[in-house]
Amino acid sequence: VWLYNEAISHFGGQTEAFFASLARPDRAPEPGVLPGRALRVASIDIGGGTTDMAITHYQLDDGSGNNVKITPQLLFREGFKVAGDDTLLDVIQRYVLPALQTQLQKSGIADASQLMASLFGDSGRIDTQAVLRQQTALQLFMPIGHAILAAWESSDVDDPLAGLHATFGDLLTQKPTRNVMNYLQQAIDHALPAGSEHFDLFSVPLHVSFREMRDAMLAGQFTLAAPLHAVCEAISHYSCDILLITGRPGCLPGVQALIRHLQPVPVNRIVWLDKYQVHEWYPFSQQGRIGNPKSTAAVGAMLCSLALDLRLPRFNFKAADIGAYSTVRYLGVLDNTINTLRDENVWYHDIDLDKPGAKLDARLHFPLRGNVTLGFRQLANARWPATPLYTLSINSAELAKAIAGDGVLNVRLKLRGGTKQEGPESFELSDAWLQDGTPVPPDALTFKLNTLADRRHSGSHYWIDSGSVYLK
């Protein structure tokens, strides 16, 4: 979308002039490439569930004027399962829950943290309150969190005193259902001392400083900060000409401040697509600008489809050359709470799932002493964030007792699927045995996908599905 709009609307179809004006003079051109005939564009898409980054090299051929073709080459891509939903959870845990807990303590409840844990924590089991806990998150905490983020997004970044001062009731456009209110009120009334005043949930005060939120983002106290640090480091390494930022969380002042602070490219080369001016050709434009950030994906796909049929006048783009690749290069055991894959925990190196007929080294096997989460990273750098992929758990009581003693479980993985023309589809458990050579039956182990990035809770459910938002 950005490439087409710049070339056609701002440069009148003169793609050569467009490339020459934006190419960085401080980056040496590739061998055999004339200066000003290539652009290196990075994009960061911060969505609700994932943060995705791609660095693409755009090269002009030997044509001139309107008769020139753009050939893209994907240099690097990465994606992390940390994005807007995690920022919402951070806001709930940093501001909403402490405000409620403080008000409970002021009302006379001595052990407010225990009450909060029983109402909103992770019980580790499916109990009768599971549905009510989830509905509380959906009807109470998430709307308040969204209201805080919306106020932050529209705030004056130059006002050091900007903030949100309201009550829970002020921020709720729709009150929770009677069942949810009864669930909360009964538990609170039971914990209140005898003779206490009625606790009004909608009167809980909430005070949020937007400057403090920005400082927390810059200090890395938001979950989203870690993947942004990683992708900005990669973008800086590639000396990109332009950085495009899209996605609703990218509109937050704290996210914008962090990216400007990291400065993967000079600030004047960062394009925020939420404020990007488009012309009448853009089908979803709102007052000359991109309204819905999600629309850029649909319009970009439309442009690629039209380019394949040569139906874009004055814009020749070789869309067929854009292809993704697997980012699974190093697979191993993740740390318990943070998504880090240390070098000593890497099981398999230099995996290539795009290679037809790829196989894992059958000689390799690995010792286990309990349930583990397997994850992967793309780079040979232990600092690079890893992504959870599988959980390997023991579901046999006899096997668990053997391992709890002096036993060590050895496991071996293999790749499933794939042909001479296509790469493999997934990993699976090949075989397992104890250190004395006793084979372990397949039904004693469970090897399943688990791509949840947030492992701060002991449960295996996503926080929006479980409603478990309180951390002890």
Regions inferred by a protein language model and the residue ranges of each:
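Glycine-rich phosphate-binding/hydrolytic loop that grips phosphoryl groups
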Residues: 1-13, 85, 89-90, 271-329
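Nucleotide/phosphate-binding catalytic cleft detector across ATP-hydrolyzing
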Residues: 1-41, 449-472
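Extended, charge-rich low-complexity interaction segments
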Residues: 17-35, 39-40, 45-48, 106-119, ...
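Long C-terminal appendages of very large multidomain proteins
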Residues: 345-472
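Conserved helicase motor "Helicase C" RecA-like lobe of SF1/SF2 P-loop NTPases
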Residues: 251-271
